[in-house]
């Protein structure tokens, strides 16, 4: 088995397989690594190597995930596959594996099943922007009309969660046949067709440095004769000396000017995504700024108190609660650098939430936070993490 190193010149895309248990997600993942490693180098990972995924701890949550990588003509892909349904739920909500696109695997023999629906809903809630479909196990279906029927069902299901069902690429094949080296249409060619569609359908994500500037404030200092300095790690974009920026969250949005950027005691012209910097703010008093606010490019992000969220509640074994909670529960919501108290409303018909569940809820915070869809947070009680969530929609 050749272990040739990847050239890192190609654009990098994060993807993953989603879909119902036993529809063939892991077999497809193995087939992708086998066929593409033969074409473009990289490492073939067998089914059982992928299936016994190591457990990782992400923000105190135990998630089993397999990471594989492969290359196409155009791109380098990092691909995640999870052994169990609960792992998918946790993975998608915590953002442990942020996906630029997902491959939904549906067994042609069974059609869409409950987790097919649940994974599409999760993808919608957590902001996975693009879904492609691999209609698997086509070798078990003799009737072409049945295939068409399943394809129609999948497209309608995607539509019902606001994905463009009619325009979604659907590739019919058999991951197992492809893995076994079958060269008929449903074998290896179906895998090559799938990656061709991935290259074409999933756009290259915008790099962090090209996005609008945002820096969560971690600390605030007053330097005599210089003014107020805030420190933090630039999450995205670039801030240049002399630019106008906004301070957003916790209170009224304020405008200020960046008059200096400092890193490791050196003065810079700019701070870029990934840098830990101190930013000097003109005319801003120390008491006007606090941890939990963000510095941002003007008008790029707004403060909100009320939102819909998808939340995973830690199980007792993960150090979470031992008892359920109900509507009106008031924990802290930890966004970026700080905790804000909020009250939760459960959906109609949901009495309570048990540890280990995932749930859609409405949250009302007591102070506004700079927020947008896709923002991750932790749910805490007195400093202990009891849940993880993602903002699925801002309300007000």
Swiss-Prot record:
Disulfide-bonded cysteines? none
List the Gene Ontology MF annotations in alphabetical order. Answer: GTP binding; GTPase activity; guanosine tetraphosphate binding; translation elongation factor activity
Recorded coiled-coil stretches = none
Residue ranges, annotated region (G2): 60-64
Q: Which residues form the tr-type G domain?
A: 10-206
Q: Which reaction does it catalyse?
A: GTP + H2O = GDP + phosphate + H(+)
The membrane-spanning stretches of this chain are none
Q: For this protein, what is the EC number?
A: 3.6.5.3
Region called G1, residue ranges? 19-26
Span list, region G3 = 81-84
Q: What is this protein called?
A: Elongation factor Tu
Q: Which residues bind GTP?
A: 19-26, 81-85, 136-139
Reply yes or no: does the keyword GTP-binding apply.
yes
Q: Which GO terms describe its cellular component?
A: cytosol
Per UniProt, the keywords (alphabetical) are: Cytoplasm, Elongation factor, GTP-binding, Hydrolase, Magnesium, Metal-binding, Nucleotide-binding, Protein biosynthesis
Q: Where is this region: G4?
A: 136-139
Q: Where in the cell is it found?
A: Cytoplasm
Q: How does it assemble?
A: Monomer.
Query: Hey, which family's this protein in?
Result: Belongs to the TRAFAC class translation factor GTPase superfamily. Classic translation factor GTPase family. EF-Tu/EF-1A subfamily.
Region described as G5: 174-176
Write down the Pfam families for this protein, in alphabetical order.
GTP_EFTU, GTP_EFTU_D2, GTP_EFTU_D3
Its annotated function is as follows: GTP hydrolase that promotes the GTP-dependent binding of aminoacyl-tRNA to the A-site of ribosomes during protein biosynthesis.
Which residues are noted in the entry as Mg(2+)-binding? Answer: 26
Q: What class of enzyme is it?
A: hydrolase
């Amino acid at each position: 088995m050749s272990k040739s190193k990847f050239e890192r010149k190609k654009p990098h895309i994060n993807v993953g397989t989603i879909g119902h248990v036993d529809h063939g997600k892991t077999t497809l993942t193995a087939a992708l690594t086998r066929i593409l490693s033969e074409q473009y180098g990289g490492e073939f990972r067998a089914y059982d190597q992928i299936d016994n995924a190591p457990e990782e701890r992400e923000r105190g949550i135990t998630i089993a995930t397999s990471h594989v990588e492969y290359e196409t003509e155009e791109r380098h892909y990092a691909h995640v596959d999870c052994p169990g349904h609960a792992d998918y739920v946790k993975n998608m909500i915590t953002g442990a594996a942020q996906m630029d696109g997902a491959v939904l695997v549906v067994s042609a023999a069974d059609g869409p099943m409950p987790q097919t629906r649940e994974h599409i809903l999760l993808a919608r809630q957590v902001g996975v922007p693009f879904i492609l479909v691999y209609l698997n196990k086509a070798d078990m279906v003799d009737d072409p009309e049945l295939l068409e029927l399943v394809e129609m069902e999948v497209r309608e299901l995607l539509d019902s969660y606001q994905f463009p069902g009619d325009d979604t690429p659907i590739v019919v094949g058999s991951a197992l046949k492809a893995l076994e080296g079958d060269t008929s249409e449903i074998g290896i060619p179906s895998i090559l067709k799938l990656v061709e569609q991935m290259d074409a359908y999933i756009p290259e994500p915008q790099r962090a440095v090209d996005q609008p500037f945002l820096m969560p404030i971690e600390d605030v200092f007053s330097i005599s004769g210089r003014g107020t300095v805030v420190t933090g790690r630039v999450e995205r974009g670039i801030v240049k000396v002399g630019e106008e920026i906004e301070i957003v969250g916790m209170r009224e949005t304020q405008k200020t000017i960046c008059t200096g950027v400092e890193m490791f005691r050196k003065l810079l012209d700019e701070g870029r995504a990934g840098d830990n910097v101190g930013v000097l703010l003109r005319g801003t008093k120390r008491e006007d700024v606090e941890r939990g606010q963000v510095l941002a490019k003007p008008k790029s992000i707004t403060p909100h108190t009320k939102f819909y969220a998808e939340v995973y509640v830690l199980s007792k074994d993960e150090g979470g609660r031992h008892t359920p909670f109900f509507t009106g529960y008031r924990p802290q919501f930890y966004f970026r650098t700080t905790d804000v108290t909020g009250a939760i409303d459960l959906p109609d018909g949901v009495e309570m939430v048990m540890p280990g569940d995932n749930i859609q809820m409405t949250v009302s915070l007591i102070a506004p936070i700079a927020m947008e869809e896709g923002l991750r947070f932790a749910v805490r009680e007195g400093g202990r993490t009891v849940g993880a969530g993602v903002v699925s929609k801002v309300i007000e």
